[in-house]
Amino acid sequence: MNLVITISRRFGTGASLIAQELSEKLGVPVYDKAYIEHELDDDSYATEAEVIKGLAEHPCIILGRCASEILKDQPNVFNVYVCADKEDRIERIMKKESLSHDEAKEMLEKNDAERAAYYYENTGKVWGDVNNYHLAIDDSEVGIDGAVKLILEYLNHL
């Protein structure tokens, strides 16, 4: 089966780590913003969507970039949304970026607002609406390993 997993997430969650661990367990590549933007001839959403559709011709994990919406009509696409407690996200950002609590909180709020605007602008939908995903995971509750186990367990039932 040509399984494609899309992972949408709030800024500061462990979604990148979840994607990497899934990649190792499933033996498929992860494509993120940096990879996708590197493949673009221009920065239009339509071009980005074409790149994502091309990547989805083979088993892979796509992190962000409205991939769940871009691939919504394709078979064998499994959409995951990762969220986490705001304070947990701030703590992760503080550690990763060496920021104060206030700086990390500001970065989180700015990034979340930008992601919400980008998603709405390009899809007409509300970012983070769990109705757009097969599975929503709070990694504050289950951790990175728990999230990976949940996703793998869900996939075993498909």
Which residue stretches match the model-derived regions?
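Glycine-rich phosphate-binding P-loop
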Residues: 7-22
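ATP-dependent small-molecule kinase phosphotransfer cores
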Residues: 34-59
